[in-house]
Regions:
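Short His/Asp/Glu-rich catalytic/ion-coordination signatures at enzyme active sites or charged loops
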Residues: 38-45, 77-91, 145, 149-166
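Short, charge-rich amphipathic segments
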Residues: 23-40, 96-113, 142
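Acidic low-complexity segments
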Residues: 1-6, 51-133, 164-202
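N-terminal alpha-helical targeting/anchoring segments
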Residues: 4-62
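Detector for glycine-centered tight turns/loop "hinges" at secondary-structure junctions
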Residues: 12, 125-129, 149-150
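Short helix/loop capping segments that flank catalytic or ligand/cofactor-binding pockets
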Residues: 152-153, 203-206
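Short beta-strand elements
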Residues: 21-32, 131-159
Length: 208
């Protein structure tokens, strides 16, 4: 399941805001004859309606399973190992983060998308195993522009907002943007020594 919010910025101002909620579940049914069938369904978060959908799906699996061929390679663990891992949602305050972003973009032409949300995954089987994992994070993918319409692309993603980390990334981007604002120099054909950042070298290797 996913619950996330997003905000689109343009010229340092909030232009659009929205949210996304998605819930899906996969049912897997097996028998002693090594037959197995799966089905994935979308749920809407309404308990009675979702239960009805899951019961119909389970009945479908029970009806179709006997007609399937056996899978001689089918194996599954019979040991039970239950776990529960949950992150602290309070470490992310969308309003506080956006207020700081808007303040930092006061004199900048900033364009980007801020998104934050929760991911939930769980597993349960007829042997009694229960596994649950929830995680919370945010991502701010953005670019800053100068008057020549040159841009520097930046990203800050984490599970906990840190003002110093964000400011460091932004200030480094501003420094690079200032360099792009310098007068252009035409380089004639010839042999030159060139320094490539690790990220630039990685892109070249990926193209090979």
């Amino acid at each position: 399941a996913e619950e996330s919010n997003f905000v689109r910025l343009n010229k340092g101002k909030i232009r659009q805001a929205g949210s996304v909620k998605q819930i899906s579940m996969t049912l897997s049914l097996s028998n002693n004859d090594k037959r197995n069938l799966k089905s994935s369904v979308r749920l809407n978060g309404t308990y009675d309606r979702d239960i009805s959908t899951l019961i119909k799906t389970l009945n479908y699996l029970r009806r179709e399973l006997p007609d399937l061929p056996k899978d001689p390679y089918m194996m599954f663990s019979k040991s039970v190992h239950s776990t529960e891992i949950s992150s602290d949602r309070q470490s992310i305050d969308d309003k506080e983060i956006l207020e700081h972003i808007m303040y930092s973009a006061n004199n900048l032409d900033m364009v980007g998308i801020f998104s934050s949300g929760s991911i939930f995954t769980g597993l349960a089987n007829s042997l009694g195993q229960r596994n649950w994992h929830s995680d919370f994070s945010f991502s701010f993918d953005y670019s800053i522009y100068n008057k020549k319409n040159n841009a520097i692309k930046l990203n800050y993603s984490s599970k906990k907002w840190n003002e110093e980390d964000y400011n460091f990334i932004l200030n480094k981007g501003i420094e690079k943007l200032d360099i792009l604002s310098n007068p252009e120099k035409i380089i004639t054909t010839g042999r030159y020594k060139v320094y490539l950042e690790p990220s630039a070298l990685n892109e070249i290797i990926d193209m090979m």
